Amino acid sequence: MYESYAEVFAASPGHREYNERLADFLPDLLGRVGVSARDVLDVACGVGDLAMGLARRGYTLTGVDLAPAMIDIARQRAAAADLAVDFEVADMRRLPYTAAFDLLLCFGDSLNYMLTAADFRKALTAMRRALRPGGWVIFDLLTDYAVATYYADQAYILQNSDEVFEAHENDYNRAREVGTLTVTAFVRRPDGTYQRVRETHHQRGYTPERVQRWAEAAGFTDLTWFTDWEIAETLDEDDSEPTRVFCMARASGRIAAP
């Protein structure tokens, strides 16, 4: 997953712009809520846009992703920008860190790739273990409503340029509660020909209530849920059906058994 698609993903201006905005507002958010952080882990970092943006703002960054091709691009970009960011291949369910970070980030609905409760809980436990006591995690999540809605037999074009064409086809399996995204792309090569890329991705939606129970069991406390990406309105203040939600939680002194 994200292997043949990595180059297409890296070319998307939407992903890059979103992460630039995140890098802009996160330091302000941390200041507003009184969170002090130096060592930051970006889980499911992709091609490293957010990690590099935060590194430019003075944080010490480590980025991990399951896809080696994504990490290869992230390393190349960091080297070209002369940024000291440590990019490593790692599975979020088995992060190779213990009490190493003050802040852990996981965006891009990456936790929705955990298709079972067991895998989701493993990821939360690994995240808690990677944090120092008193450290914080911030992640986003597509709700069950969002996945059922977004994946309801939709098709659209995400990129259409001379260099890259990218189309998405969505499908939702109600029996399994899993959304399937099929990506078809054509990438222009130096000789003028186009390479066809095709990947399939699966995501599952979860309710904040369910995830909160798992996070508390993993060793997180002081959970707060928000309904917009600038983290300005809490979940209980929003009367609409939530789609993408955000969570901040603090690492307690307790870590669940792996």
Please give the residue ranges for each predicted region.
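Class I SAM-dependent methyltransferase SAM/SAH-binding core
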Residues: 49-94
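A short acidic, Gly/Pro-enriched loop at the edge of an enzyme's catalytic core
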Residues: 93-103
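A short glycine-rich, Lys/Arg-flanked "PGG" loop and its adjoining helix->strand segment in the class I
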Residues: 121-133
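SAM-dependent methyltransferase
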Residues: 138-213
